[in-house]
Structures are given as structure tokens and as C-alpha cells.
């Protein structure tokens, strides 16, 4: 049994990283590192987590299911298309019914508004496993990976190059929360959501973080400690081939990384499209830590699950 204190969270759900304080994020990361060293701890014995998927998944499904098993609980896969919700049952009714059967819900879907409604109407914790707007579990794992490499966030520069998508949104909020310097470089028209950038800038004023949204990839990666990218076409965007030409200057390759620190590390949330957003030379090279990063999804989510479940128990 763990001797490390389980972090107390002042939230029932995790829909975006706005809901966590800097202190809570750091505590979750430290707890995740502990769980990484002590995989089999039955901290959620007998608990059931419902896993609702409307989008394809490898890392999210396997890491949540494996995490629940390692914690002594059970992950129950629920296909959104096969549930009554896929045939017109309301999100509200679904939330209330599932609250009678299971102990928590993880949902990976398109509409962030649906996840917000699910959380509002359920009496059990709801975790956002990905929406079109946010990917908080990925960002937690990313912060954990950076922290393992540097043991600090102060003075660390993270450069995100590519599409200003859901991953970028969560990284902006994450970087702002922990006081990190984050630069984003996207083509014109593919910047991150303006409202989310405003939120990140407001948080940064309180934490001392530095947030920049640019269009020059060389300027963005200048002296960066970490370079991060994602696919140019997210699920549901296939067929927008004109993006390839527009995004080509934003490819992470050996020329671009010369502007970063020599000791930079490469991050990618995966799946990757080699020779599109990143060359094989970079993602398979010695400075890439993408598979360690993917592995940390398991540990960060385990820490989150235990903390949310325990915090809700104490509040009830």
C-alpha cells in the first residue's frame, strides 16, 4: 500500500486543466512518478470506470484500462455508437443512469459541450479523454515527462509547432499553470482558439509564465528545451490536402531543430505521420522521448483517477 499522500483535488471532474491549481498539478505529477515506480497498488479496489469512446483510440483506451487493472479496479469499454446515447438518448439521462452503476466516467468524443453536460448531470467523476477543444490527460502526461527530464518548470521553454488544435490548447493552459515559457508557431488561420489563448495569458500573469503565439517556426523553437508537434490533420479532417503545402515550413526536421538548444528533447502525442509533421530522423533519433511520453499517459492518468475518486469520496 502506498505511503505517499494522495493529492486532494477541489474538483469532481477534469474537463480542462483550468480546473486544477499549480499545486494540484505538481502533486499529481509527483504522485504519478511514485505510481510509475510502484505499478501494482490496489488503491481503487472494486471501482468501475466507464470508458465512452466516440473516436478511435490506442493510447487512451489501453492506458485507462490497464491503469484501472493495476489499481485493482475495472475499466468498462462503452462504444458511443452502440449505447442508447448514439440513438438519441440525452446526455443528461445517460449521465444519471451511469451514475447508478459505475464509479466514474472517461469520455473521448467530439463536442466539449457534451462532456460539460455529462459532468454537470452525473454524480460521479467525469474525465475528458479528448474533445475537439481539449486533451487534458495528454497535457498532464506531457508535464510529467518534462518534469522527469528537468525536475523543474521554471526557466523551461516548450515550443509547439504545427496546428493550433486541442493538444495545443491543453498545453497552453498547462504551461501557464506551472509557470513555463511556451511558444506556439502555426500557419496563418490555424492559430489556437483566441479565447483559450486569452485564458492562458491571464493565468500566466499570475504564475509568471510566458505565452507567445507566432507564425515563425524558427523563432518559436529558438533556444527551446522541448519541441512538440502533432499531426497536421486531426481525426475528421482527412481530405484537407491543401494543408500539406501550407504546413510544410512547420515540419520538425534537422534544419529547424538547429535553432533549439543542443540538448533539446522532442515530444509528440502520437500517432505520428513520419515525413509529414516530423521526419523519421527526428522522431526516431536520440533526442526523441515520444515513447516515454506515451508511457506516462498510464501513470499520469492513474494518479488522476485515484485523486479524483478519493477527493469525491471525502466530499460526499
From Swiss-Prot:
Carbamoyl phosphate binds at residues 57-60, 84, 108, 135-138, 269-270, 297. It is an enzyme of class 2 (transferase). Pathway: Amino-acid biosynthesis; L-arginine biosynthesis; L-arginine from L-ornithine and carbamoyl phosphate: step 1/3. The keyword Transferase applies. Its EC number is 2.1.3.3. It catalyses: carbamoyl phosphate + L-ornithine = L-citrulline + phosphate + H(+). The keyword Cytoplasm applies. Gene3D superfamilies: Aspartate/ornithine carbamoyltransferase. It holds the Pfam family OTCace. Belongs to the aspartate/ornithine carbamoyltransferase superfamily. OTCase family. This is Ornithine carbamoyltransferase. The gene is argF.
Amino acid at each position: 500500500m502506498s505511503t505517499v499522500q494522495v493529492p486532494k483535488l477541489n474538483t469532481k471532474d477534469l474537463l480542462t486543466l483550468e480546473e486544477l491549481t499549480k499545486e494540484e498539478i505538481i502533486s499529481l505529477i509527483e504522485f504519478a512518478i511514485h505510481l510509475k515506480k510502484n505499478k501494482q497498488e490496489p488503491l481503487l479496489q472494486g471501482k468501475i470506470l466507464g470508458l465512452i469512446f466516440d473516436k478511435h483510440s490506442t493510447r487512451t483506451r489501453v492506458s485507462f484500462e490497464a491503469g484501472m487493472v493495476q489499481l485493482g479496479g475495472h475499466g468498462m469499454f462503452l462504444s458511443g455508437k452502440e449505447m442508447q446515447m448514439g440513438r438519441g438518448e440525452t446526455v443528461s439521462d445517460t449521465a444519471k443512469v451511469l451514475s447508478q452503476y459505475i464509479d466514474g466516467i472517461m469520455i473521448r468524443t467530439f463536442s466539449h459541450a457534451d462532456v460539460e453536460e455529462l459532468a454537470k448531470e452525473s454524480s460521479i467523476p467525469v474525465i475528458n479523454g479528448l474533445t475537439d477543444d481539449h486533451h487534458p490527460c495528454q497535457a498532464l502526461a506531457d508535464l510529467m515527462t518534462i518534469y522527469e527530464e528537468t525536475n523543474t518548470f521554471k526557466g523551461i521553454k516548450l515550443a509547439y509547432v504545427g496546428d493550433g488544435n486541442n493538444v495545443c490548447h491543453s498545453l497552453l493552459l498547462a504551461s501557464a499553470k506551472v509557470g513555463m515559457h511556451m511558444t506556439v508557431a502555426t500557419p496563418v488561420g490555424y492559430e489556437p482558439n483566441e479565447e483559450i489563448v486569452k485564458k492562458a495569458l491571464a493565468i500566466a500573469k499570475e504564475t509568471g509564465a510566458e505565452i507567445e503565439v507566432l507564425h515563425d517556426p524558427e523563432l518559436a523553437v529558438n533556444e527551446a528545451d522541448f519541441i512538440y508537434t502533432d499531426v497536421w490533420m486531426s481525426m475528421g479532417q482527412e481530405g484537407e490536402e491543401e494543408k500539406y503545402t501550407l504546413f510544410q515550413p512547420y515540419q520538425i526536421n534537422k534544419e529547424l531543430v538547429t535553432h533549439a538548444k543542443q540538448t533539446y528533447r522532442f515530444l509528440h502525442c502520437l500517432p505520428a505521420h513520419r515525413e509529414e509533421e516530423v521526419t523519421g530522423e527526428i522522431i526516431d533519433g536520440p533526442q526523441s522521448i515520444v515513447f516515454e511520453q506515451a508511457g506516462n499517459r498510464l501513470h499520469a492518468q492513474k494518479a488522476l483517477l485515484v485523486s479524483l475518486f478519493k477527493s469525491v469520496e471525502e466530499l460526499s
